[in-house]
C-alpha cells in the first residue's frame, strides 16, 4: 500500500476515519480522503501533510446521494489513481425505541451503513483487482454479534456488514483482494459518545476504546490479512462468551443493559 498507490478512506474527517487516515499516513500510504463538505477534511489533510511525506487527495461529498459514489469513482479514474486499499469507515447510528425514531432517520442509517458500502465495493473492486495485493476493510461493530434492543436498525445494519464482508472475502479468496471486517465495541468519537459512556457507568470504561486504538488495531489486522478484527481483549472475550448464552437469556441481559436508551 505504498509507492504510487493510494488508500481510500470514507468518513475520514473525524473519529475513527480520521484515526485511520493518520495511522495510514504514518505507514507511508498515500491517501484519498472522503467526507462530508463541512470543512474538517481540509484540516485533516493539512495536519497529515505537515507530519508525513505522503500524497493526500480529498473529495467532499454526501455519499448517500444517488450518484455520489460514481462521482468519487469518476474522480479517481480521471486522476488515473492506482488504489490498493479501501477502508469503508463512513457510518451513522442512533439509539432509542424503534417506534420513536423517525423512519427517515432509520433509512438514513441503512443508506450509509449498507447501501453506500455495497456501492463502494462494487465500483472500486475492479480497480483493486488490478493490483498484485489489495485490501478492503469494512467497518462493522461488536454489536453485529450482540443485537441490541433500542438500537435495532443500527445493529441490524452492522450485522449486514459483517455477513457481507465474510461472504465477499470467500468469493475473492483466489484473487489479490483480501476483505477484512473490523468489529469495535464502544468508541468515544465525540461529546455525545462521552456522555453515553458516562451514562453506563464504570462498566462501560472496561470496553470503551479511543479512535486511534481502533484504527491501529484495525490496520494491523488488515495488513496481516485477518478475517475478523475485534479491537480490545475484553471485547473479544465478551463476543466469545456471548455465544455460550441461550439467545433468550442474552437478549434479556442486553435489554436491561441498554434500557437507558428506551426513553429516547
Can you say where each PLM-predicted feature lies in the sequence?
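Substrate-binding pocket helix/loop in short-chain dehydrogenase/reductase
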Residues: 97-110
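Conserved glycine-rich cofactor-binding loop
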Residues: 11-15
Amino acid at each position: 500500500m505504498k509507492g504510487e498507490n493510494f488508500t481510500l478512506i470514507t468518513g475520514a474527517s473525524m473519529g475513527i476515519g480520521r484515526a485511520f487516515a493518520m495511522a495510514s499516513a504514518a505507514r507511508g500510504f498515500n491517501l484519498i480522503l472522503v467526507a462530508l463538505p463541512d470543512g474538517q477534511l481540509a484540516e485533516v489533510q493539512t495536519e497529515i501533510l505537515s507530519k508525513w511525506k505522503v500524497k493526500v487527495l480529498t473529495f467532499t461529498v454526501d455519499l448517500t446521494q444517488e450518484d455520489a459514489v460514481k462521482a468519487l469513482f469518476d474522480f479517481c479514474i480521471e486522476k488515473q489513481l492506482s488504489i490498493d486499499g479501501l477502508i469503508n469507515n463512513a457510518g451513522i447510528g442512533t439509539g432509542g425505541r424503534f417506534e420513536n425514531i423517525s423512519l427517515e432517520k432509520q433509512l438514513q442509517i441503512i443508506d450509509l451503513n449498507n447501501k453506500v458500502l455495497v456501492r463502494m465495493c462494487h465500483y472500486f473492486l475492479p480497480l483493486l483487482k488490478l493490483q498484485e495485493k489489495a485490501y478492503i476493510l469494512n467497518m462493522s461493530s461488536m454489536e453485529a454479534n450482540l443485537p441490541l434492543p433500542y438500537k435495532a436498525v443500527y445493529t441490524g445494519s452492522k450485522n449486514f456488514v459483517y455477513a457481507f464482508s465474510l461472504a465477499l472475502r470467500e468469493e475473492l479468496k483466489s484473487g489479490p483482494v483480501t476483505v477484512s471486517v473490523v468489529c469495535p465495541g464502544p468508541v468515544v468519537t465525540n461529546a455525545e459518545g462521552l456522555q453515553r459512556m458516562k451514562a453506563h457507568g464504570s462498566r462501560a470504561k472496561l470496553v470503551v476504546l479511543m479512535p486511534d486504538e481502533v484504527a491501529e488495531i484495525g490496520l494491523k489486522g488488515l495488513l496481516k490479512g485477518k478475517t475478523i478484527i475485534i479491537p480490545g481483549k475484553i471485547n473479544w472475550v465478551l463476543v466469545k462468551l456471548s455465544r455460550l448464552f441461550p439467545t433468550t437469556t442474552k437478549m434479556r441481559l442486553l435489554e436491561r443493559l441498554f434500557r437507558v436508551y428506551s426513553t429516547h
